Regions:
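The conserved cystathionine-beta-synthase
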Residues: 18-35, 42, 83-85, 91-109, ...
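Short N-terminal signal/transit or membrane-insertion segments
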Residues: 12-20, 47
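Short, surface-exposed, polar/charged, turn-prone segments marking secondary-structure boundaries
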Residues: 38, 45-46, 67-70, 77-79, ...
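Tandem CBS (Bateman) regulatory domains
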Residues: 1-14, 52-90, 97, 102-106, ...
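A glycine-centered beta-loop-beta connector
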Residues: 31, 39-55, 105, 113-128
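Short, charge-rich amphipathic segments
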Residues: 32-40, 59-60, 66
Length: 145
């Protein structure tokens, strides 16, 4: 039953993270190598921000209309994650229920919700995770990662 389902049952726990002092070329490389669009930014296990493909696209659009990988590499390697990450975070706890997660997604225009316990990042939920979970629940199946 959805009312009893906690966030911990469908959050992703194997996370790739970056540090605020990492450069945006590392972020670009991680996005290119993986099938995700959000990266939690962590300092000493504490979530300090999130960087997404949206921030990366804003930066690369500033370069110009003609793509030049060398210019792109030089430019992105000069920008720190901490300079462009989203610091205004909406988070959720692993013990919260699915309705709280839906409510938080409904609050704003974002597609990932960091799961934080005692100040530390323990998981991540994306809007895709939530839709997939609800679809499987409605089909009568349990969604497990």
């Amino acid at each position: 039953m959805l009312t009893n389902t906690q966030v911990s049952h469908f959050m992703t726990t194997e996370l790739v993270t970056v540090h605020p002092d990492d450069t945006m070329d590392k972020v670009r490389d991680l996005f290119e190598a993986n099938d995700f669009h959000h990266l939690p930014v962590v300092r000493d296990e504490i979530l300090v921000g999130v960087v997404s493909t949206r921030e990366l696209l804003k930066l690369t659009r500033n370069i110009g209309t003609k793509y030049d990988k060398k210019i792109d590499d030089d430019y992105l390697s000069s920008i720190l994650v901490g300079e462009v990450m989203n610091k205004e975070l909406i988070t959720i706890g692993p013990g919260e229920n699915i309705y709280k997660a839906i409510e938080k997604f409904n609050q704003g225009y974002f597609h990932s919700l960091p799961v934080v316990y005692e100040g530390k990042l323990v998981g991540l939920i994306t809007s895709t995770d939530l839709i997939r979970f609800m679809y499987n629940e409605l089909k009568g199946e349990r969604f497990l990662f």
